[in-house]
Curated annotation (Swiss-Prot):
Belongs to the PlsX family. This is Phosphate acyltransferase. Pathway: Lipid metabolism; phospholipid metabolism. InterPro entries: FA_synthesis (IPR003664), Phospholipid_synth_PlsX-like (IPR012281). It comes from Photobacterium profundum (strain SS9). Catalyzes the reversible formation of acyl-phosphate (acyl-PO(4)) from acyl-[acyl-carrier-protein] (acyl-ACP). This enzyme utilizes acyl-ACP as fatty acyl donor, but not acyl-CoA. GO terms for molecular function: phosphate:acyl-[acyl carrier protein] acyltransferase activity. GO terms for biological process: fatty acid biosynthetic process; phospholipid biosynthetic process. It is found in: Cytoplasm. GO terms for cellular component: cytoplasm. Its EC number is 2.3.1.274. The lineage of its organism: Bacteria, Pseudomonadati, Pseudomonadota, Gammaproteobacteria, Vibrionales. Homodimer. Probably interacts with PlsY. Pfam families: FA_synthesis.
Length: 341
């Protein structure tokens, strides 16, 4: 691929251009083929650019918008009043072929609703799913979905999530990703009817390497490459994990910060631990993809800092280069055809 363009909702998140503009410049330095379109308040964006001594401005376009979808806006209201907002304009750029992907740290519900409205779902996809990588004990990562796009699902939808997650994992990890269903136990008799029905469907699909159920305490064990659940369970699991990780990291920092000698000894004695703690930092995995659409949309944490938002841009670049929507569409067509026979 000779070049690609990512549209950024520059006004989304807790910090807006203060974080997103430096993150855009950081991404441009990392990806020479990348161009950025910034949608938002022109004066606020240029003010941030003026603070940065970089030479990549020729690859940045600013499209002015003084309208922002507030965090408290309901998705239904956002659909009716989205014209001219920074989020809608960034999504329209993807829909109109002016950009290859969109990244936003704005209102999650509004982003999902507007993404479905502007980009539409791929054939064979009932509902898009939010997916993100999570760390494991090993060198690889695990993809967890759904993370909140659908608080309730049927078995067919969970099956589609498994297919989409497998395609994404194949492009990053292995040619035959291990797929598991998140459940309250590993035994076949455990779980509700929804999970059992999906397990049966996955077991009968030759295109999916289904390994069975996995419990919550094994999320980070590296036993599966893709873990599937509904959005309610996935969101609670992820937020709980992030809270525990932050508690551990902050407690450790607080302990060693009280004494200079402790800090010195910690850096010397616990170098490997510092590497492990960095791996647990949720910012390293910022950027949840909305899979199942005809275009690429990545959701960043609203509280993301510059490095974290740059990671979200990197995820968008990764998916564009690997043509994830096209590969998901092709795989779903194959799987659905086999199920009909």
């Amino acid at each position: 691929m000779t070049g690609l363009t990512v549209a950024l909702d520059a006004m989304g998140g807790d910090f807006g251009p203060q974080v997103i503009v430096p993150a855009a410049v950081q991404a441009l330095l990392q990806y020479p083929e990348l161009k950025i379109k910034l949608y938002g308040d022109h004066s606020a964006i240029t003010a941030q650019l003026s603070l940065l001594n970089q030479h990549s401005y020729s690859r940045i376009s600013i499209i002015h918008s003084d309208l922002v979808i507030a965090d408290e806006t309901r998705p239904s209201h956002a659909l009716r009043r989205s014209q001219g907002t920074s989020m809608r304009m960034a999504l329209d750029a993807v829909s109109d072929g002016e950009a290859d992907a969109c990244v936003s740290a704005g209102n999650t519900g509004a982003l999902m609703a507007l993404s479905r409205y502007t980009l539409k779902q791929l054939p064979g996809v009932d509902r898009p799913a939010l997916v993100s990588a999570i760390p494991t004990h090993g060198l690889n990562k695990t993809w967890l979905l759904d993370l909140g796009a659908n608080v309730s699902c049927d078995a067919d939808t969970l099956f589609q999530f498994a297919v989409m997650g497998s395609v994404l994992a194949e492009q990053s990890l292995t040619s035959k990703p291990r797929v598991a269903l998140l459940n309250i136990g590993e035994e076949e008799i455990k779980g509700n009817d929804l999970v059992k029905r999906c397990a049966e469907m996955l077991s009968n699909s030759p295109d999916i390497h289904y390994i069975g159920y996995i419990e919550g305490d094994q999320l980070y064990a590296g036993k599966a490459d893709v873990i599937v659940c509904d959005g309610f369970v996935g969101n609670v699991s992820l937020k709980t994990s992030e809270g525990v990780a932050n508690l551990f990291i902050n407690s450790f920092k607080q302990t060693i910060s009280t004494n200079p000698m402790k800090r010195l000894l910690a850096k010397w004695l616990f170098r490997d631990l510092f590497v492990s703690l960095k791996k647990l930092n949720p910012d390293q995995y910022n950027g949840a993809s909305l899979l199942g659409l005809r275009g690429i949309v990545v959701k960043s944490h609203g509280r993301a800092d510059t490095a974290a938002f740059a990671n979200a841009i990197g995820e968008a670049v990764h998916e564009v280069k690997r043509q994830i929507p096209t590969k998901i569409s092709d795989r779903l067509e194959e799987v659905l055809l086999e199920r009909h026979y």
